[in-house]
Amino acid sequence: MNTNFERIKDWSDERLITQNEPDRNGFVSMIVEELGEFLEAKDNIEGRIDAMADIIVFAYGEIAKYGYHGDKVMDEVIKEISSRTGAYDPATKKWQKDKSPEAQARWYTANFTNCKL
């Protein structure tokens, strides 16, 4: 069975979308449009889920335009964020990474070399 990335890439290939050059401004425009839909959804959870899923579709499509495999890219990114230590800060509602020299010495940096299509 194909992964979500592969299914999205196949869908984009069938419509010749991935044949286009990467378009930074076009990508940003699509993401901003979806963020607007997310904000408009207010208390409509499914509307928010739809907007977030569309953002993933656009991101995977753009990654493919750059010639990278989205699942492999995500594997590298997950390795990178998993190598960091820190704690959730309730005041900021954000996870704060430990930036001490000892913690940074253990950080993994994503390597996208083997993520090409």
Residue ranges and their predicted role:
Residues 1-52, 56-117:
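Flexible "arm" and connector segments at domain edges
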